[in-house]
C-alpha cells in the first residue's frame, strides 16, 4: 500500500482520508413487554463497528463488500461523519483531524434512496439546490452553467425537463449524484448506488463515478449542448441562442472489455471544475457500499474493502484480492464473479473463522504506520486546503426562507388537482352550513341560539380543517429535512419559518372565502365591516390551528399516531371553548383553548353593538334584551379591547405551539444521522 503516498499528478499532493479505530455502539433493541421493567433494567449496547481502520486517496474508487448486517452503511456513515451517537475513533485528512462541518464541505453523501422533491424537473431541482450549495457570490449565469455541465456529465440531457417522479430509477440515481456534485466535492460516499437498478443503469452509475475519480478535465458546455439546438428559456427568462459558441464535447472510448454491454451508450464527458472551487487540481475519491455487484461493475472499482461482523477483514487493490484468497487456500474458480466468491467465502463458517481472521491480521499489519514520512510533509498543504474550503459563504438566512417558500408553493401548484379536490370539499361544507342556518332572521330569542351555533361551527370548521390538514407534514418530510439540514444545505429555522409563512396566505384566502358563502345568507344585514373583522379573526384562527396541527405532527414520526393522539387535545379544547360548559366554573383553563378565543371574538363582534332583542309575550320564559347580556350568558368578556385581545392571544398561542414544535423537530433531526 505504498501507493498512498504518491502525488496526484494534478498539480499538488494527493489528499488522503484515513479513519482509525472506529467503533460504533447502539442500544440493544431487545425489550420487555413491560415499559416499567425496560426503564429499570440496565441498558446494554451492541457494537456495530469494531476497530475499523483504513484509508482512501484521490483517484480511488472503493467498494465496500459484505453480507447483510456486516456494517457497510454504518462504516460509510462513520467515515463521512454523517453518523450520530456513540462513535469513537479518528478521521483525519493527510494527518489532520477532521471536524464534522469540515467533512461536509469537502465531501458528499449519496443515500441509498433518493430524497428530493418529486414535482420538480431535473433542471429545476439542480438549479434550486445550486443556490444553497454554491457560494453566495456566484452569479445566476454561473449556476446555470454548472447545472448544464452536471446534466450532461451524468447523461440527463434528454431528461432535463422531465419531472423527477417520472424518471427511471437509474435516472433518479444519476440526478442524485449530480446534486452531490454541485459543490465539486473531493470525496464521494455512496450507499448502495446500484440498488433497484437494472444492469445497464447500475453500470452507467458506477462508470460515471469512475470518470470522476480518474479524470479532471475542464469541460465547459453551453446550455444548447445540454438542452438541444433549439432556443432554451432559463428560469430567469433569458434565452440561449442556438449554436452560439457551442464547443464540441470530447467523448471517451469505451473499454474493450465492456463494448458488448455498452455498444449503444455514448460515454459521458468529464465534469467542469467550479471557477471558485479549491478542488480543481484534484481527482476525486469515491467509496461505495454495494450489494452483489456484477463482474462488469466489480472490475470498475480500483480497491475493495471486505467487511464481516463490523470488522474490516481486507482492504487493497481489486486485482490483488484474488491472490490474498489464493494464498489462504481459497482458489477463485474460472468464470466466477469475484465479488460473489469473496462474500460466499466469508459467509462460510470455515472461511469466517480462518480466512476472515488471517485477512484481518494481514490488513492490520500492512496499515500499521501507513501515514508516516511523505504524508506528514503534506499536512501543511491539507491545512491550507481546509482554510480555503472554510471561506465558503452560504446564502443569507432570509434568502433561504424565500427560496424554501418558493419550493413549497411550487409543490402546491404542481399538485393543484389534489388541492382543488380538497378545496371543493371545503366549499361543500360552507354551502351546507349556509343552507342549515339560512333561516336566521331578525333579532329574536331564537336568533341568539342560532347565531351562537353558526359561529361555533365557523370556528370549529376553520380550526379542524387547518390543524388536521398539516398533521402529515413532518412525518413525511423528516427524511428530507434531516438530510438537507444535516448536510448544511439550509438551516432548520429557515425551513420552519418558510413552512409557516407559506400557510399564511392560504389561511386568509380560505378564511374569507368560507365566511363569504355563509355571510351572504346569514349575516348580510350587519354590513361589510363586520364581514372584514369576522374574516380576519377566522383567518387568525386558521393560522393558530396550523400551529396546533404542526405541534401534533412533530410529536411523533408517524402521521397515524399524530392523528390518533389528537383526540384528547381536541376534547379538552372543545370543552373549554365556551359552548359545552360555562367556562367560569373552570377559570384559567379556558385560556388554553383555541376555540375560546375564536368563539369569544366572533361573538363579541356580532353582539356588542346590539341594544335591543325582541322578547316573547310569555313573560315566564327568560329574556335576553341586549348583546351584552348574550356575551355575559356565555361567560364572554365585553370590554372594548376584547376583540383585539383575542386576536393577539391567538397569535401568542400559535407562537407557543411553533416554538414547542420546532424544539421537537430539532430533537428528531439531531437524534440520528443523516445518511
From Swiss-Prot:
Membrane topology: Multi-pass membrane protein
PROSITE patterns for this protein: ABC_TRANSPORTER_1 (PS00211), ABC_TRANSPORTER_2 (PS50893)
ABC transporter domain span: 34-261
Cell compartments where the protein resides: Membrane
Similarity comment: family membership: Belongs to the ABC transporter superfamily. ABCG family. Eye pigment precursor importer (TC 3.A.1.204) subfamily.
Group of enzyme by EC: translocase
UniProt cross-references to NCBIfam families, sorted A to Z: 3a01204
Organism, as annotated: Drosophila melanogaster (Fruit fly)
GO biological process terms, semicolon-separated: aminergic neurotransmitter loading into synaptic vesicle; eye pigment precursor transport; guanine transport; sensory perception of sound; transmembrane transport
Intervals, Cytoplasmic compartment: 1-419, 482-497, 553-568, 666-675
Residue spans of biased composition, Low complexity class: 236-248
Residues annotated for ATP binding in this entry: 66-73
Stimuli inducing this protein: Up-regulated during aging in intestinal stem cells.
Name of the featured protein: Protein brown
Consequence recorded when altering residue 578 to D: In T50; normal eye color. Eyes are brown due to a reduction in red pigment production in a w/white co2 mutant background
Renumbered residue ranges of the record's region Disordered: 229-249
